[in-house]
């Protein structure tokens, strides 16, 4: 169904007054293609202001990628290598500790670590990584791993995913990365990441994580071979989980970076999302995910100019400094590995909004 202008404005007014968007209504919003898109972004930004105020938040964090060696071969990934590849690397716990110590010296409040599914990794491998971080960066929040890594550690160790999560928690993991979600539609997963866990397993592990006291982020990767219907199914799954667990700290839309990926080179994906699609993904996420407070716009994926558009389209968070970033850059992203808070302040002040440093749980640092 194509919404005429009157129908669009009426729907947006209803949402601003508390109406929960249906799946069909969200699909219709995603299909808006002309300047009426700006009515959607304006409504989303007004809702952002009502829900979050005018602060733009950011976190001083450092990314540590422990290895790019991976048993999987996801079509959207330009980062992973097989054992013996010339670009393959693996950090020992000692090297992870050195990076963690450097991060601590920079004053970060969060260290984020993810890894390829290394064939030699088991639960103890992950625990040794967390121990190295904890010992070398005491007091720094550990934001680590994702449901795929949890499932992998469980399989390699012969224990349950719940036991893995409890071990992660006891080792100091504060929050789980909500990545490996991609698109939570198995027909699409079978194309882009057939070796990854199913939608049901991802949902189950995320719920187990939340129930174990480990909150997580939530993500979507869009702009490849999925449809608008698939996108909204994904958002609906996340909204249902949040209704049940209240365990998501934020939602992070991740725009597909195409140039260096097998999926694109084989003609199985389009060349990423358009600017309109990026803008509407942020805006409609704000309108549809009425039980999420925080919507993050990814500078790594979009670059600073599009980030600023996202901050006018419903987003309230700009992510982190990172210092190191390998996964998106390997796929062809050009935004770099580090975002200076001075640049964050520049675009925030240009919007007449205040930049506020936060912790992982969104409490202010100062």
Swiss-Prot record:
Pfam families on file: CofH_C, Radical_SAM
What CDD domains does the record tag this protein with?
Answer: Radical_SAM
The pathway is: Cofactor biosynthesis; coenzyme F0 biosynthesis
Q: Which reaction does it catalyse?
A: 5-amino-6-(D-ribitylamino)uracil + L-tyrosine + S-adenosyl-L-methionine = 5-amino-5-(4-hydroxybenzyl)-6-(D-ribitylimino)-5,6-dihydrouracil + 2-iminoacetate + 5'-deoxyadenosine + L-methionine + H(+)
Which InterPro entries does this entry report, sorted A to Z? Aldolase_TIM, CofH/MnqC-like_C, CofH_family, Elp3/MiaA/NifB-like_rSAM, F420, FO_synthase_su2, rSAM
Per the entry, the cofactor note is: Binds 1 [4Fe-4S] cluster. The cluster is coordinated with 3 cysteines and an exchangeable S-adenosyl-L-methionine.
Q: Which SUPFAM superfamilies match?
A: Radical SAM enzymes
Q: Which cofactor does it need?
A: [4Fe-4S] cluster
The molecular function terms of the Gene Ontology recorded here are: 4 iron, 4 sulfur cluster binding; 5-amino-6-(D-ribitylamino)uracil--L-tyrosine 4-hydroxyphenyl transferase activity; 7,8-didemethyl-8-hydroxy-5-deazariboflavin synthase activity; iron ion binding
Q: Where is [4Fe-4S] cluster annotated to bind?
A: 70, 74, 77
- UniProt-listed Enzyme Commission number(s): 2.5.1.147
- Enzyme class per UniProt: transferase
Q: Which UniProt keywords apply?
A: 4Fe-4S, Iron, Iron-sulfur, Metal-binding, S-adenosyl-L-methionine, Transferase
Lineage, top-rank taxon, reads: Archaea
- Residue ranges constituting the Radical SAM core domain according to the UniProt record: 51-290
Question: Briefly, what is this protein's role?
Answer: Catalyzes the radical-mediated synthesis of 5-amino-5-(4-hydroxybenzyl)-6-(D-ribitylimino)-5,6-dihydrouracil from 5-amino-6-(D-ribitylamino)uracil and L-tyrosine.
Q: What HAMAP family does the record tag this protein with?
A: FO_synth_sub2
Which family would the database say this protein is a member of? Belongs to the radical SAM superfamily. CofH family.
Q: Assembly state and interactors?
A: Consists of two subunits, CofG and CofH.
Query: What is the name listed in the Swiss-Prot or TrEMBL entry for this protein?
Result: 5-amino-6-(D-ribitylamino)uracil--L-tyrosine 4-hydroxyphenyl transferase
Q: Source species, please?
A: Methanospirillum hungatei JF-1 (strain ATCC 27890 / DSM 864 / NBRC 100397 / JF-1)
């Amino acid at each position: 169904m194509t919404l005429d202008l009157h129908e669009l404005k009426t729907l947006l007014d209803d949402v601003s007054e508390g109406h929960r968007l249906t799946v069909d209504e969200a699909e219709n919003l995603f299909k808006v293609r002309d300047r009426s898109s700006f009515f959607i972004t304006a409504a989303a930004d007004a809702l952002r202001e009502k829900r979050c105020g005018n602060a733009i938040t950011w976190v001083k964090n450092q990314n540590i990628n422990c290895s790019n060696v991976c048993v999987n071969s996801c079509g959207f990934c330009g980062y992973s290598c097989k054992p013996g590849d010339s670009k393959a690397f693996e950090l020992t716990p000692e090297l992870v500790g050195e990076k963690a110590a450097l991060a601590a010296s920079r004053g970060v409040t969060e260290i984020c670590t993810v890894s390829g599914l290394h064939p030699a990794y088991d639960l103890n491998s992950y625990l040794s990584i967390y121990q190295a971080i904890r010992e070398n960066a005491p007091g720094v929040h550990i934001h680590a791993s994702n449901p795929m890594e949890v499932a992998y550690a469980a399989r390699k160790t012969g224990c349950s995913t719940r036991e893995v999560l409890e071990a992660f928690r006891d080792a100091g993991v504060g929050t789980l990365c909500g990545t490996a979600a991609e698109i939570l539609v198995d027909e699409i997963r079978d194309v882009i990441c057939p070796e990854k866990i199913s939608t049901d397993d991802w949902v189950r592990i995320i719920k187990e994580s939340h129930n174990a006291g480990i909150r997580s982020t939530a993500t979507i990767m869009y702009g490849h071979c999925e449809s608008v219907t698939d996108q909204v199914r994904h958002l609906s799954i996340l909204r249902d989980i949040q209704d049940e667990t209240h365990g998501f700290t934020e939602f992070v839309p991740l725009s597909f970076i195409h140039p260096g990926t097998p999926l694109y080179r084989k003609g199985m994906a389009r060349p990423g999302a358009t600017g309109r699609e990026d803008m509407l993904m942020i805006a409609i996420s704000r309108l549809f995910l009425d039980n999420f407070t925080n919507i993050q716009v990814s500078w790594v994926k979009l670059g600073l100019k599009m980030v600023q558009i996202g901050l006018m389209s419903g987003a309230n968070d700009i992510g982190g400094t990172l210092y190191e970033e390998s996964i998106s850059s390997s796929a062809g992203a050009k935004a770099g590995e580090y975002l200076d808070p001075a640049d964050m302040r520049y675009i925030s002040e240009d919007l007449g909004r205040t930049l506020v440093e936060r912790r992982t749980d969104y409490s202010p640092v100062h």
